């Protein structure tokens, strides 16, 4: 017998917002009777940008900026129809990208 599984991947720049959203999803899934594996922290992607400080001269003087993209993975095992309805109605924060597989 094949079991159904919902895999949810969350991405955000702010890890506090990400953990809060993951907690809401876990709480909703457990309340409706599904089993939850996670949240599993995935590697943080760091994009670094180097720019010149001066617009004209002084090439040696540079400034670095970085953007950190935090990721979490959630597996919802054996979801019920109530779980699907509750997850569809769930309103998460604006800064969190949700990808469902």
From Swiss-Prot:
Designated name of the protein: Small ribosomal subunit protein uS10
Similarity comment text for this entry: Belongs to the universal ribosomal protein uS10 family.
Keywords: Ribonucleoprotein, Ribosomal protein
Annotated function: Involved in the binding of tRNA to the ribosomes.
GO annotation terms (biological process): translation
Native source species: Anaeromyxobacter sp. (strain Fw109-5)
HAMAP family linked: Ribosomal_uS10 (MF_00508)
Molecular function terms, GO-annotated: structural constituent of ribosome; tRNA binding
NCBIfam families in the cross-refs: PRK00596.1, rpsJ_bact
Top-level taxon in the UniProt lineage: Bacteria
CC per GO annotation: ribonucleoprotein complex; ribosome
């Amino acid at each position: 017998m094949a079991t159904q599984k919902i895999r949810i991947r969350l991405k955000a720049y702010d890890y506090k917002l990400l953990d809060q959203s993951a907690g809401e999803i876990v709480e909703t899934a457990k309340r409706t009777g599904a089993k939850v594996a996670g949240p599993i922290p995935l590697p943080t992607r760091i994009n670094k940008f180097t720019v010149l400080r001066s617009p004209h001269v002084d090439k040696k003087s540079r400034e670095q900026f970085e953007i950190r993209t935090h990721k979490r993975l959630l597996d919802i095992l054996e979801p019920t129809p109530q779980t699907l309805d509750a997850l569809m109605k769930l309103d998460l924060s604006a800064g969190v990208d949700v990808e469902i597989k």
